[in-house]
């Protein structure tokens, strides 16, 4: 049994390893630069974060001549499948081009998996640390690269910091909430007054990959977070009450429709005043008392009519006939003919 279980685990491990190898071998043309006001720029293709993996549904194999041929044959419109490191999603981008027109971007064939893994999330930041002096924002900023060279592997950042102790280190920082990338310079130092060389916690792995960008930056102090469309937009001004308006007057009682009203269909609700109870169960409203008396009178009249109708029906109804006599057997000769006559009738 244990031998079969061992073989099963071995097969599953090999299958999972094959899946990981296939995912690691996924590649595409990485966008290194996008020219301003170009076709790629207007199509919102981002440098550093985007990989072109297919053209018109045809997967690319890293051959630049194949890529250029597909672009020439796609006139007047080409569809690019673009993989983004932000959220690890693939989108389709349509670009209208001519056969001899340039898209306006610089590409390099590269593997996607190492780029997805080369992300470090800035967690807690200690005050007066090298990272705090560089104005890094905790839980919003991500280290995505450096001009010093490629960063691959989980220990790439720590090795880079160790090699730049007491020296300026340039880093590319991506802010998730503002969807912007900036370059900062920090000086790693183990004698700045706290733990570590840069003074912050760093997260790495699947849980700390680049998320998809938000629709906009987070609200700042004084910004309108929620608005009521009934107020006419954010420019609507609310008047401030004066000191005399802080106390509201007593509102008028509401009005209800009356079914018995003649010329007017509205009557005001009567105001009741609290009095001492004269006896238990006393009714304060005369209109309610008259209504109850009228209902009691109608109930008595209806009950009286019902009794009269039942007595009349009893007098006019024909009584039921009595049951027939029961024949009795006897040895007396005089009663025998009478019994026989009753049976014949």
From Swiss-Prot:
Domain PDZ GRASP-type as annotated: residue spans: 27-112, 118-207
SUPFAM superfamilies xrefs: PDZ domain-like
Annotated region (GRASP), positions in chain: 27-223
Pfam families for this protein: GRASP55_65
GO annotations of cellular component type: cell division site; cell tip; cytosol; Golgi apparatus; Golgi membrane; nucleus
GO biological process, any: Golgi organization
Record flagged with keyword Cell membrane: no
Biased amino acid composition, Polar residues: 309-318, 328-338
Disordered: annotated span: 229-345
Segments of skewed composition (Basic and acidic residues): 297-308
Entry keywords, A to Z: Golgi apparatus, Membrane, Repeat
UniProt-annotated location(s): Golgi apparatus membrane
Protein name as annotated: Uncharacterized protein C1D4.02c
Repeat found in the keyword field: yes
């Amino acid at each position: 049994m244990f031998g079969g279980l061992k073989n099963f685990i071995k097969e599953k491990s090999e299958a999972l390893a094959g899946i990981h190898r296939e995912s690691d071998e996924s590649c595409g043309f990485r966008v290194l630069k996008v020219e301003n006001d170009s076709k790629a720029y207007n199509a919102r293709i981002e440098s550093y974060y985007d990989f072109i993996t297919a053209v018109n549904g045809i997967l690319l194999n890293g051959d630049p001549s194949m890529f250029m041929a597909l672009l020439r044959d796609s006139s007047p419109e080409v569809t690019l499948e673009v993989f983004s490191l932000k959220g690890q999603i693939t989108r389709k981008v349509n670009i209208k081009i001519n056969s001899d027109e340039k898209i306006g971007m610089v590409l390099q064939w590269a593997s996607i998996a190492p780029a997805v893994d080369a992300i470090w999330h800035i967690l807690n930041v200690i005050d007066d640390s090298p990272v705090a002096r560089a104005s890094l924002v905790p839980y919003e900023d991500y280290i995505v690269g450096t001009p010093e060279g490629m960063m691959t592997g989980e220990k790439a950042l720590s090795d880079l910091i160790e090699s730049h102790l007491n020296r300026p280190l340039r880093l590319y920082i991506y802010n998730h909430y503002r969807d912007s990338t900036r370059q900062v310079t920090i000086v790693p130092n183990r004698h700045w007054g706290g733990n570590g060389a840069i003074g912050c916690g760093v997260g790495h792995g699947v849980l700390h990959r680049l998320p998809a960008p938000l629709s906009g930056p987070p609200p700042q102090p004084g910004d309108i977070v929620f608005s009521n469309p009934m107020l006419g937009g954010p420019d609507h001004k609310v008047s401030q009450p004066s000191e005399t308006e802080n106390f509201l007057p007593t509102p008028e009682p509401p009005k209800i429709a009356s079914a018995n009203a003649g010329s007017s269909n509205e009557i005001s609700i009567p105001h009741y005043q609290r009095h001492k109870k004269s006896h238990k169960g006393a009714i304060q409203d005369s209109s309610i008392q008259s209504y109850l008396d009228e209902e009691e009178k109608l109930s008595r009249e209806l009950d009286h009519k019902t009794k009269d109708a039942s007595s009349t029906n009893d007098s006019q109804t024909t009584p039921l006939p009595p049951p027939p006599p029961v024949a009795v057997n006897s040895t007396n000769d005089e009663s025998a003919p009478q019994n026989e006559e009753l049976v014949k009738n």
